[in-house]
Structures are given as structure tokens and as C-alpha cells.
């Protein structure tokens, strides 16, 4: 009942050296790369999201949830077993085929990039996405967040984590060099590594605002060492709706330098998102 496949518009005019999932050739190369990556990890049925599950359930009230970048869909299964109407999307096809073929068959999860989420608008009151956005090319970030906004209900919450460093598969030393040699596609694994303030500016431009209380709750319940460890730069607790206070401003934890924890922002985020919305309207009417 939630599924509504959107009209797909493919942009084939991609600048040289600028990879994007909306380019059909690049899309197939990315899917191949991540399937090969899954094989390198011996098809491990891991759940990166599960460490956050208790914190999410304690903090947020939700009946419907989308896990964007659900991997092998372990968290989706756990949530459904607890009565939540949880769904998932995953750009790589192999993890779902190996570990979630039943969920693929019944339309609970889909193998699709975040730019083309096959669910109706305003379907979910909770969004999760753990260690996914750094894998998305920068040219596709705004389209991805725009799709999350489309399927999220007004007032929905989101918990998103974004990697803040170069992937070990983007280096070439020792064991890593051997692993990289087995991957035929030479795109980066971590395409978009940006400072915390850049992400806050980007989310805010799309109407997602930081919830500092929820963020600290997640740090306390899900960060190894809890509040005794520095708050992670790449964790974001967000609410879709009207801003409260200064939700786009990065708050620096005690003992940390703003240049390290927050970094440089994205001053043109609102302008870039406004252009995207204009382009999407043109595509829809074409």
C-alpha cells in the first residue's frame, strides 16, 4: 500500500569525471562496485544500524520507518518483529538477494538508490540512514535528501550518521591494496566527506533541523563510552518542519575546537536546493 514508483528522469549530461547515480552507466558501475565490496566482506550479514536501535526506540515514537541504505535489512526485520511497519532501500543488490529475498519479494525492501525511493509521499514518521551519505556522489546529495523529505511525514524525525573520513578502500596499503585490486570499478567508496557544518547547512536547506536533545540522547545511549567520549561529528538527529532556536548552527562540545568539530559550512545550500526544486518541476512537466 505504500509503494508508488516515481517517474524517473535520467540525466545523461554528466560532466567528465563527475560521477552520479542519475547517469545510467555510472549507476551500473556503482552497483557492481558495491556488490564486489559485499563479496570481499565474505557476504557478512552485518547490521551497522542495530547499535542505534535501542536509542531510537526509546527516544522516538513512530509506527512507520524507512531505513535508507538498509544493507541486509537486519534492522528492518527487527523492527517489523516489534510491530513497526519498517521498510528499506539499498543501492547494492547482492546483500538483499542473499539475506532478504523474502522481503524483496513482498515489497518490504527495494534495491534502488536513494534518489528514487519507490514509496508514496508522506509515508514515514521516522527515517534512519547509517553510514550511507558519504557513499553518495556530491552531485546526488540534494536529490537524495529531497527524496527522503518527500516520503517523510510533516514533523517526522530522522537519525542519520555520515562517515567523516576517507574509506580504507580508497587507500592502497597492505591488505587494503590487495582488496582494492579485486574491485573492478575505481570510483571512491567515500565520495562525499564533508564537515559537520556543511551537512547541517544542507539538511536545513531541505527543511530538516537539528534536535540537540535527541542528539545527546543518541550519544548517551549509542556511542561507545556514552557521554564520557566526545560526541561524534557525523551523527545528526533531525526533525522535518519549522526551526527551533538555531538548529543550523553547529554547537561545539566542551574541549573541542570549532575548526575540527564543525568545520566549514555550505553557504550556498539554500540557493542550490532552490535550483534543484526548480529543475525537478521542469522535469515533472517535460
Q: Which residues make up each language-model segment?
A:
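Active-site-proximal loop/turn and secondary-structure-junction residues that shape catalytic pockets
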Residues: 132, 164
Amino acid at each position: 500500500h505504500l509503494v508508488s514508483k516515481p517517474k524517473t528522469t535520467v540525466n545523461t549530461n554528466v560532466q567528465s569525471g563527475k560521477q552520479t547515480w542519475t547517469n545510467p552507466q555510472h549507476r551500473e558501475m556503482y552497483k557492481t562496485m558495491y556488490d564486489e565490496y559485499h563479496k570481499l566482506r565474505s557476504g557478512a550479514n552485518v547490521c551497522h544500524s542495530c547499535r542505534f536501535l535501542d536509542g531510537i526506540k526509546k527516544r522516538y515514537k513512530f509506527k512507520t520507518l524507512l531505513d535508507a541504505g538498509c544493507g541486509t535489512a537486519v534492522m528492518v526485520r527487527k523492527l517489523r518483529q516489534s510491530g513497526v511497519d519498517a521498510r528499506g532501500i539499498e543501492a547494492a543488490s547482492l546483500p538483499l538477494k542473499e539475506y532478504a529475498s523474502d522481503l524483496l519479494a513482498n515489497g518490504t525492501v527495494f534495491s534502488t538508490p536513494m534518489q528514487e525511493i519507490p514509496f508514496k509521499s508522506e509515508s514515514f514518521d521516522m527515517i534512519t540512514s547509517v553510514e550511507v551519505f558519504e557513499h553518495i556522489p556530491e552531485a546526488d546529495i540534494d536529490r537524495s535528501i529531497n527524496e527522503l523529505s518527500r516520503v517523510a511525514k510533516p514533523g517526522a524525525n530522522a537519525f542519520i550518521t555520515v562517515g567523516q573520513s576517507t574509506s580504507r578502500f580508497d587507500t592502497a596499503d597492505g591488505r587494503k591494496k590487495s582488496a582494492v585490486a579485486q574491485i573492478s570499478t575505481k570510483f571512491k567508496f567515500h565520495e562525499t566527506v564533508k564537515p559537520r557544518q556543511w551537512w547541517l547547512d544542507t539538511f536545513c536547506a531541505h527543511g530538516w533541523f537539528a534536535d540537540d536533545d535527541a542528539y545527546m540522547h543518541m550519544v548517551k545511549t549509542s556511542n561507545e563510552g556514552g557521554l564520557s567520549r566526545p560526541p561524534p561529528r557525523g551523527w545528526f538527529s533531525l526533525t522535518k518542519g519549522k526551526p527551533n532556536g538555531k538548529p543550523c548552527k553547529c554547537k561545539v562540545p566542551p574541549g573541542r575546537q570549532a575548526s575540527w568539530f564543525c568545520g566549514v559550512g555550505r553557504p550556498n545550500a539554500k540557493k542550490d536546493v532552490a535550483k534543484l526544486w526548480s529543475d525537478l518541476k521542469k522535469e515533472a512537466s517535460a
